[in-house]
Regions:
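"Rare, low-scoring activations can occur
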Residues: 73, 77-78, 82-84, 150, ...
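Beta-strand-rich non-transmembrane domains
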Residues: 86, 114-122, 129, 136-153, ...
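Single conserved hydrophobic/aromatic residue that forms the stacking wall/gate
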Residues: 2-8, 13
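Membrane-proximal extracellular/periplasmic loop immediately following the first transmembrane helix
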Residues: 26-115, 147, 346
Length: 377
């Protein structure tokens, strides 16, 4: 009976060890990806959306009318935003956003044969200060949308893909794969970037606003960095209340303002990431408790069936502490024996690529860390 009980306990611990490892592995994948730098700093950064009143739009058929009725009012909106006491800096941009599914891609090449699909952001020069993008080489002093070739800031991996090395990439030129006449010159190389906490790094390019932005009267987003002491929970509501009337510069008006922290919360909830992580944590807690109860039950069962042996050992001079440590050692040995087949199952799962690898690679270092965490738990 005792042998059957031990075999049953070992199988129970093996199964729970495997499931606990899988959940810990998932949590580790999310945590490790979240700790990796995104290539920009979103703390104390807010996104403003400006809209326009259809009844106040003036048809612009010339460059002068565009400047008078579109770009000058937009510049006035930006000027008023920058004058707000809590604002450190503000910038306009268009293209790929963070914590959303909105992506803008373009293909780039150096030889018109090999194309590198790249994530694109069109930005004003102040964007690099607002987002605190670290430049590894070069600078953005020549940020001019009328220059030819157009200036561009590329991530290190894009420089590697285009030029086979990021070293010495500043000053080199590349082409728009789909519009061969559109040329770019690398002004700077920046750190690796990704679109959100759990995404993988990918090639990014940041360039000035293209010609169609000015011709088709696109509305850019506005990102602003505020002073840390002003970043309170109600800042967005306070800013909206203070600036709603001031930003009514025909044809524009303030539509909304949102922090990237809130945008991340909404995206995680919409994509199911938050409940997924919560479920994994609850499963880990459940199995930790389950294994603890199983080990305690096994310890209690073995102790009750070995009362005569324990009494004999005490009669022979063994102390209570020594017997306790012996039984605990046997329990740990049982756990070690049960973990051997569990480890084989876990290794097979890694080899079969059925673990969570969307955000983090399944490396042996990750495997050892997760197994160690399960053992400690």
């Amino acid at each position: 009976e005792m042998q059957r009980s031990l075999v049953g306990s070992e199988m129970c611990i093996r199964d729970r060890f495997t499931l606990m490892w899988y959940c810990v592995d998932v949590l580790y994948g999310f945590a490790h990806a979240e700790r990796q730098p995104k290539g920009y700093d979103l703390e104390h950064v807010y996104k403003i959306r400006i809209s326009c009143n259809p009844t106040q739009i003036v048809p612009c058929t010339s460059e002068d009318s565009l400047q008078t009725f579109w770009f000058k009012p937009m510049e006035e909106v930006l000027r008023r935003i920058r004058q707000y006491p809590a604002v450190e800096s503000a910038a306009t941009w268009l293209g790929t956003d963070t914590y959303t599914r909105g992506r803008v891609y373009q293909g780039y090449t150096t030889d018109s044969v090999h194309v590198v699909e790249t994530t694109v952001r069109y930005v004003s020069p102040e964007y690099f200060d607002v987002m605190r993008i670290p430049l590894l080489q070069g600078n953005v002093s020549d940020w001019n949308s009328t220059a030819s070739p157009l200036p561009a800031v590329v991530t290190r991996d894009l420089a590697d893909s285009l030029f086979q090395t990021s070293a010495g990439a500043v000053g080199r030129e590349f082409l728009d794969y789909y519009s061969g006449g559109l040329r770019y010159r690398v002004s700077a190389v920046c750190a690796l970037q990704k679109t959100d906490d759990y995404a993988r790094y990918g090639p990014f390019v940041l360039t000035p606003f293209p010609g169609w932005f000015y011709e088709d009267q696109y509305l850019p987003f506005i990102s602003l960095r505020i002073r840390p002491e002003a970043d309170t929970d109600n800042f967005a509501a306070r800013f909206y209340q203070d600036m709603m009337s001031q930003l009514q510069v025909a044809p524009f008006y303030l539509f909304d303002i949102q922090s990237y922290k809130d945008q991340k919360i909404e995206r995680d909830a919409a994509e199911g990431i938050t409940p997924y992580i919560r479920s994994a944590r609850l499963i880990v807690i459940f199995f930790v408790f389950n294994v603890f109860i199983g080990l305690m039950g096994t310890f209690w069962f073995r102790t009750r069936h070995r009362r005569s042996e324990i009494a004999l050992r005490m009669a022979m001079g063994s102390s209570r502490g020594r017997i306790r440590w012996q039984l605990l050692g046997e329990g740990l040995l049982l756990l070690a024996l049960a973990s051997i087949p569990a480890l084989m199952i876990c290794i097979n799962m890694v080899m079969a690529d059925v673990t969570f690898t969307e955000a983090t690679d399944a490396t042996w270092g990750r495997f050892v860390i997760c197994v160690s965490i399960v053992w400690i738990l």
